[in-house]
Amino acid sequence: MTLIKSISGIRGTIGGQAGEGLNPLDIVKFTSAYATLIRKTTTNKSNKIVVGRDARISGEMVKNVVCGTLMGMGFDVVNIGLASTPTTELAVTMEGACGGIILTASHNPRQWNALKLLNEKGEFLNAEEGQEVLRIAAAEEFDFADIDNLGKYIEDNTYDDKHIEAVLALKLVYVEAIRNAKFKVAIDCVNSVGGVILPKLLERLGVEKVEKLYCEPTGDFQHNPEPLEKNLGDIMGLMAKGGYDVAFVVDPDVDRLAMICEDGQMYGEEYTLVTVADYVLKHAPGNTVSNLSSTRALRDVTRKYGCEYNASAVGEVNVVAKIRATNAVIGGEGNGGVIYPESHCGRDALVGIALFLSHLAHEGKTVSELRATYPPYFIAKNRIDLTPETDVDAILAKVKELYKDEEVNDIDGVKIDFPDKWVHLRKSNTEPIIRVYSEASTMEAADEIGQKIMDVVYSLAK
């Protein structure tokens, strides 16, 4: 059993004893702590909290415990049922709610679940708020409602349609152009909530044909749910046979978008954001944001339009903060996460699909031809295992000093930008390891510079 408590929420494997896995007692504790924080900090008078969940097998149990606890804390619950993460985020603002809880473990395997916590803007709690939830939970500073102040329970299953309408209403989504292109599309939704909402979206966008793979929302994932090439053999094989223009693949909560070209080759999840940003910047030039571990291609595309690129620390809440601070027109993360503030400040695969198809319709290229128009970069990912007594911060400080003549960013670990490549070192908050990301114009060069910096770290750790 595993239970991980962090500033972004609580996640774990279902079962086990209290404090050792994600079970009803721990769910009650952290839901109560979240409700206590919202009661103290919200400026909203609605008294509502929205709850949505992905299709995980444990979702029904977790939902019942969460909803009952929120009612016991005196909040009215708006349960929107099976819903994507971006749908739940939008529902918070559409309802005028005080906050929201998303029940999803994202791309983690079926035995996992999690509580992801939203503020009244439908955005994830910041680090300070997340830390306060952990403190309240540890101290058990809960004050449950008396009989006259228990919350009410409402079910509202209309938010998929409301989300789709919001996407269709975006100025840069051109339904007529998509319809005229007569696209044939395949989708893999890993038997979660994407299987409910994506076919509806594609139909409303005017896509001519949709081939559905693993679209039953049973929570019985047919492959590892992270949308990486090694997990997508079935849909890549389908695409390689021909007959489809593009395939879209989402994770269980539909905030990450991967794509497959018409020839069965991966588009590259780093390039989901790059491509959508290219389209947005062409029509509405402005600043862009991604995290430090994302491809340099977004910077290159942004500069092509004479605009400014900014990097944030890793994590959606940090990307959103930088988007707001720089008034960016688009941002996101290199894992296929597209954040389009014109819609809302959260990763949203539906927005990504609609903008990508609009771009593809206007360009008149095949998907592989479109991919070839972007700068070719390759990212290598490694890790350095250290002993628990190792002072990781001291090592990172020494690395920063060694490479002070290069462009160095230390807002999240240490990132060293060389003229034609970069390396990013990030320490784990839970283990004595350093994650190493490196990018260059070839995979060999990315591996080489990554290994070089790893050797430096090993020498400093002796």
Predicted regions and their residues:
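N-terminal small/polar loop signature for handling phosphorylated ligands or for N-terminal nucleophile
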Residues: 36, 48-112, 200-260
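Proline/glycine-rich low-complexity loops and linkers
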Residues: 71, 134-165, 169, 261-334, ...
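Phosphate-binding and adjacent anionic-ligand microenvironments
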Residues: 246, 284-462
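An N-terminal, well-structured beta->alpha segment
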Residues: 1-68, 72-73, 152-184
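Gly/Ser/Thr-enriched, mixed-charge loops and adjacent short helices
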Residues: 13, 113-240
